[in-house]
Amino acid sequence: MSLNFLDFEQPIAELEAKIDSLTAVSRQDEKLDINIDEEVHRLREKSVELTRKIFADLGAWQIAQLARHPQRPYTLDYVRLAFDEFDELAGDRAYADDKAIVGGIARLDGRPVMIIGHQKGRETKEKIRRNFGMPAPEGYRKALRLMEMAERFNMPIITFIDTPGAYPGVGAEERGQSEAIARNLREMSRLKVPVICTVIGEGGSGGALAIGVGDKVNMLQYSTYSVISPEGCASILWKSADKAPLAAEAMGIIAPRLKELKLIDSVIPEPLGGAHRNPEAMAQSLKTQLLADLADLDVLSKDDLLNRRYQRLMSYGYA
C-alpha cells in the first residue's frame, strides 16, 4: 500500500520517494555496478530516524490530522484483525439501517462480545453510503438495540469511536437526533454488563459520546476527543477556520491531556508513524488492552459495576 503523507511528514515523504526510486531502478537492471541495496538500507534507517524525530514533538493540530488520516484503520479493520467470527447485525427495527454505525457479535480471544463502532468508508461511494461516519438517529438506535441485546445475553460491549460528529441534517433532526443521543447516554449508564469504549480516530462531540459511556475509556495515541472540531472552535472564537491549529492546542483534545484530566483511562501506543503504518501491530496492542480491561471488570458484581460507572460519571469536571 502506498502511504499518503501529511504536510508535516513531507521530509519523510521525500526520503521514501528516493527509496522507491532506487528500488525501482534495482528491479529494472540487476547488472548495475553500484550497490543500491546498501544505499536503500541507509536511506531506510534515515527515514525511521527522521520519523522518530518528527513524531516525538507533534502538536495537537498535527495529531488531529493523524486522527483523520484517510488510511487510518477503521472499526471493521480492527474487527478483522483482532476478533473472530464476526456476525454483523443491522437495523434499528423502527426506521432504517444506518451504515455509519456497524455492530454485531464476535469473539475476543474466544469470548463472545458485542462490537459497536463508527465506520467512515474509504472510497467515494462507500464514504457516501456510510455518510462519512456521521450517524443519523437510526444509527444510534441500532447501537442501543445491540447494547440491550448484549445485556440480555450477558455479553461485554466494546465500542469503537471514530466520527466527526452526529449528522446535523434536517432529516436527522426531524427524526430526533438529540433524543437518540440523550437516550443512549442514559441507557449506557445503566447497562449491567461491562462496557469498554475506545477512541480510534476522531471523537467528535455528542456523536462520539452516544457510544462512549463506559466502564473503561481508552484512546489511541494519535486520536482526538472534543466537543467541537478545531476548525469549528476557531470559526466561533476567531471568526476564521485558519486558526484551527491554535484552537487545537487550546482545547485539550489529545489523549495525554485527557488522561491527565481523568476523562480517559488509558492511552494505547501506536506504531511509529501512526496506526496506518502497521494496522496489524496496532490491532494487537488494542486487543491486549481490551483483554486487560475485561479482566479488571470481570471481578466486579453487577451492583459494583454500576456503582463504579456512576461514580466515574459524577467525577467529571472541576471541583
UniProtKB/Swiss-Prot annotation:
Acetyl-CoA carboxylase is a heterohexamer composed of biotin carboxyl carrier protein (AccB), biotin carboxylase (AccC) and two subunits each of ACCase subunit alpha (AccA) and ACCase subunit beta (AccD). It comes from Cronobacter sakazakii (strain ATCC BAA-894) (Enterobacter sakazakii). One of its GO terms (biological process) is fatty acid biosynthetic process. Component of the acetyl coenzyme A carboxylase (ACC) complex. First, biotin carboxylase catalyzes the carboxylation of biotin on its carrier protein (BCCP) and then the CO(2) group is transferred by the carboxyltransferase to acetyl-CoA to form malonyl-CoA. The gene is accA. Its EC number is 2.1.3.15. It is found in: Cytoplasm. Belongs to the AccA family. This is Acetyl-coenzyme A carboxylase carboxyl transferase subunit alpha.
